[in-house]
Regions:
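Alpha-helical assembly-interface signal, strongest on the long, hydrophobic N-terminal helix that forms
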Residues: 1-68
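Short, conserved structural patches
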Residues: 2-3, 62-128
């Protein structure tokens, strides 16, 4: 009697699907949220590295570093990094660019996850 079902099992598949589907959907959305956060981190790191690369060229300039990082974000971030801010700190020997922002959220009512990435580079100095 392999193909016969017991009368008490009728509709069991529908109940199982109704219970497991929301859990699976939540898991998939959480994985996508994590992927968006990692992508936003990658964009922030790229902007920080671009700013540090531009700012360390002789003559070193924190304004040029900030402009380069902002330009990178304008070209690549669109809506993937919101509330973004670029902070540049320079010393005679190094320059540090920090990019902060928020990744988008897939869950209504919840804010995205915070993103902070920094890049430091030595200031180029001509030597005789």
């Amino acid at each position: 009697m392999v193909g016969r079902r017991l009368s008490g099992e009728r509709g069991a598949a529908s109940v199982e699907l109704a219970v497991t589907f929301p859990v699976v959907l939540l898991l998939v959305m959480t994985l996508i949220q994590v992927a968006l956060w990692f992508h936003a981190r990658s964009i922030a790191l790229g902007a920080a590295q671009e700013g540090a690369r531009e700012g360390r060229v002789q003559p070193a300039s924190t304004a040029r570093a900030e402009t380069a990082a902002e330009g990178f974000l304008d070209q690549t971030a669109s809506d993937l990094l919101t509330g973004r801010d670029v902070a540049v700190a320079g010393s005679p020997t190094s320059i540090e660019v920090t990019v902060t922002g928020t990744s988008p959220s897939l869950f209504p009512g919840l804010s995205g996850w915070s993103v902070t990435q920094s890049a430091v580079g030595p200031v180029e100095r001509p030597t005789p």
